[in-house]
């Protein structure tokens, strides 16, 4: 069965082998429009919510439009066919070529925006793609693929450049990963591990657990609004949604008060009750996230846990615990539940940030609301995360937004920290092979002095100092030596 998909994908790709940059760009725009226009996006968002029971329709519409338009913005005028770069000084020319057939695995939490964005991204390099949807979101993902194929049809491109496994299973997905040229795994840890174990070159993503420091000098109202919006958006389906905030004690009351005013409820006496509902014992005897809470509304989660909140509540707040490594609320929660810590000095806040991220979600992302460049520098130079957002909503900013310079994507590499091959936002550049053409030029060999000169002079100076110090010690000791 998978072999048939592969054959059709290769035939389609071969049929566009002659396409110029302008022609493939036209294809990307046509495909993009079909998963961007208001009529189709509403259908996709509605299908995703109805099929998966996750998120909400208005936010999915907004997410879809932002992601697709953001990707197309980045692709506009970008070179992905033929000569893409030339260095006249080094006499180097770089030529882009397709990687081939890509097997793209998609998550249940984002079953339409992910294939839409990744489909366009993969097409940019004249590749073909076969999507393996999550079984619980197969109809929504197929709808997105059908819309994209309609875009291909309208510009006369082969429809089988984009395909989907209509009845997905672990076995079929495993076979797909073995037969394609490259795998893109956007989803949970087991999926990513399977991709890396397939024997096929693969790009994977790491688990999220985004944490923000709310510094004493920040714009409190702005920071609170951005955190609240990010955490409540689409019921926190995004892996970039803030899971914890670390608030300076001097602004703690104002910040939390603003979160409550915006529509948050601080769970205090019921904290243990909420924890026991959110993390249940699995088949292996370990406590893990309750699937019933993933991307559900704060009201639904609270009601199910037996906690009374009003209809207006969009985010549940819990106080952070000192035993971070043992506390479940320190982890990724995949729900509109936010853990709140407090700190006095920056180093204390930084250590909490580090512990939270090292405990879960290493390599993914963190952020800070501040205007203090020293704070920003410390986090940027020291944290083991691939992204640091400054004065931004994490869910919107990590994957690229119109208010920052991050590359637009729905797939976030987390580097070796997160068990991934790249720490970059995954874009079209990851789906082209590049041939380097090198021409001969007159040799420019550096002298030994240029490379080693400073070092050898330092060694010589150090040696001279060491000899003088040793001689001084000998002179000091000599009066006390016995004469035989």
From Swiss-Prot:
Pfam families assigned to the protein according to its UniProt record, in alphabetical order: Aldedh
Gene Ontology molecular function: any one: oxidoreductase activity, acting on the aldehyde or oxo group of donors, NAD or NADP as acceptor
EC number: 1.2.1.-
Reactions mediated catalytically: sulfoacetaldehyde + NAD(+) + CoA = sulfoacetyl-CoA + NADH + H(+)
pH influence on activity: Optimum pH is 9.0.
Keyword field contains Metal-binding: no
Active site: 239 (nucleophile)
Keywords: Carbohydrate metabolism, NAD, Oxidoreductase
Residues spanning the signal sequence: none
Keyword NAD: yes
Residues the entry annotates as binding NAD(+): 105-110, 188, 206, 332, 412
Reported function: Part of a variant of the sulfo-TK pathway, a D-sulfoquinovose degradation pathway that produces sulfoacetate. Catalyzes the oxidation of sulfoacetaldehyde (SA) to sulfoacetyl-coenzyme A (sulfoacetyl-CoA). Is highly specific for NAD(+), with only residual (1%) activity with NADP(+). Cannot use acetaldehyde.
Family designation: Belongs to the aldehyde dehydrogenase family.
Name of the molecule in the record: Sulfoacetaldehyde dehydrogenase
UniProt source species: Acholeplasma sp
């Amino acid at each position: 069965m998978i072999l048939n998909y592969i054959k059709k994908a290769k035939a389609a790709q071969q049929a566009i082998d002659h396409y110029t940059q302008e022609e493939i760009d036209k294809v990307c725009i046509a495909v993009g429009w079909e998963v961007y226009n208001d009529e189709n996006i509403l259908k996709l968002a509605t299908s995703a919510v109805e099929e998966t029971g996750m998120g909400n329709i208005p936010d999915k519409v907004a997410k879809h439009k932002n992601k697709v338009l953001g990707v197309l913005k980045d692709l506009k005028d970008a070179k992905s066919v033929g000569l893409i770069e030339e260095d006249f000084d080094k006499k180097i020319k770089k030529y882009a070529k397709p990687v081939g057939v890509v097997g793209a695995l998609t998550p249940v939490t984002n079953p339409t925006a992910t294939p839409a964005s990744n489909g366009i991204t993969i097409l940019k390099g004249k590749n073909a793609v076969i999507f393996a949807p999550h079984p619980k979101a197969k109809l929504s993902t197929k709808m997105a693929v059908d819309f994209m194929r309609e875009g291909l049809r309208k510009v006369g491109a082969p429809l089988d450049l984009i395909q989907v496994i209509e009845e997905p299973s672990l076995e079929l997905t495993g076979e797909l990963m073995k037969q394609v040229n490259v795998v893109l795994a956007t989803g949970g840890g087991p999926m990513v591990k399977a991709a890396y174990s397939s024997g096929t070159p693969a790009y994977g993503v790491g688990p999220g657990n985004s944490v923000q420091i709310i510094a004493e000098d920040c714009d409190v109202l702005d920071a609170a609004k951005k955190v609240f919006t990010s955490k409540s958006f689409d019921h926190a389906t995004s892996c970039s949604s803030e899971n914890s905030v670390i608030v300076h004690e001097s602004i703690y009351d104002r910040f939390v008060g603003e979160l409550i005013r915006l529509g948050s409820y601080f769970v205090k006496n019921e904290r243990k009750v909420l924890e026991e509902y959110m993390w249940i014992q699995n088949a292996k005897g370990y406590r893990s996230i309750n699937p019933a809470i993933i991307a559900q509304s704060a009201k639904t989660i609270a009601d199910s846990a037996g906690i009374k909140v009003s209809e207006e509540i969009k985010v549940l707040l819990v106080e952070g615990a000192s035993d971070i490594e043992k506390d479940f609320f320190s982890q990724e929660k995949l729900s509109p539940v936010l853990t709140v810590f407090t700190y006095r000095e920056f180093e204390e806040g930084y250590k909490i940030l580090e512990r939270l991220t090292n405990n879960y979600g290493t390599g993914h992302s963190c952020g800070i609301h501040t205007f203090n460049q020293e704070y920003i520098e410390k986090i940027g130079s020291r944290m083991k995360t691939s992204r640091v957002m400054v004065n931004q909503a994490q869910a919107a900013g990590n994957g690229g937004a119109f208010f920052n310079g991050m590359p637009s994507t729905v797939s976030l590499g987390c580097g070796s920290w997160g068990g991934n091959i790249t720490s970059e936002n995954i874009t079209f550049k990851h789906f082209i092979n590049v041939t380097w053409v090198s021409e001969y030029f007159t040799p420019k060999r550096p002298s030994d002095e240029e490379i080693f000169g400073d070092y050898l002079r330092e060694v010589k100076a150090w040696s001279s100092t060491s000899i003088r110090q040793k001689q001084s010690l000998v002179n000091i000791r000599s009066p006390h030596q016995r004469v035989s």
